[in-house]
Swiss-Prot record:
Its main location: cytoplasm. This is D-aminoacyl-tRNA deacylase. PANTHER family: D-AMINOACYL-TRNA DEACYLASE 1, D-TYROSYL-TRNA TYR DEACYLASE. Signal peptide: none annotated. The gene is dtd. Keywords: Cytoplasm, Hydrolase, RNA-binding, tRNA-binding. One of its GO terms (biological process) is D-amino acid catabolic process. It comes from Lacticaseibacillus paracasei (strain ATCC 334 / BCRC 17002 / CCUG 31169 / CIP 107868 / KCTC 3260 / NRRL B-441) (Lactobacillus paracasei).
Length: 148
């Protein structure tokens, strides 16, 4: 399972011109699911991201987590994180999980974050979405459960 975590001041996701998810400040998480991923991977990522200390404390050191700053998560499914660009100019996405597994683990990830007390807004799994955000820092962190 792969995640791109971006610290943001604000973010929203729209589908066909309708805003379906919005946050004030926190993380935008782009989440990709691989074919061998399990719920243990989604739990692991939710735990890591909920405790990720990349918000500034009073002396300016990145030392605070989402809960410390009242942060939220905008969670977006992103199968393109599994793009293979080795051959040609058109990426292959055969490394991504099938949609049923991807949706199940995306929902499990969001549920785990909520169970950890993190407010979560979401896009629509498999939807054609437009995501806008104001990057803060910028701070962008990559996670891959294959490297844990």
């Amino acid at each position: 399972m792969r995640a791109v975590v971006q610290r943001s001041l604000e973010a929203k996701v729209t589908i066909e011109g309708n805003t379906v998810g919005t946050i004030d400040h926190g993380f935008v998480v782009l989440l990709g699911v691989g074919p061998t991923d399990t719920e243990a991977d989604s739990d692991y990522l939710a735990e890591k991201i909920s405790k990720l200390r990349v918000f500034s404390d009073p002396v300016g050191k990145m030392n605070l987590a989402l809960a410390d700053v009242g942060g939220q998560v905008l969670s977006i499914s992103q199968f393109t994180l599994y793009a293979d660009t080795h051959r040609g100019n058109r990426p292959s996405f055969t490394g991504a999980a099938d949609p049923a597994l991807g949706d199940r683990l995306y929902q499990a990830f969001n549920a785990k974050l909520k169970a950890l007390g993190v407010p979560v807004a979401t896009g629509e799994f498999g939807g054609d979405m437009q995501v806008s955000l104001t990057n803060d820092g910028p701070v962008t962190i990559l996670f891959d459960t294959e490297a844990k």
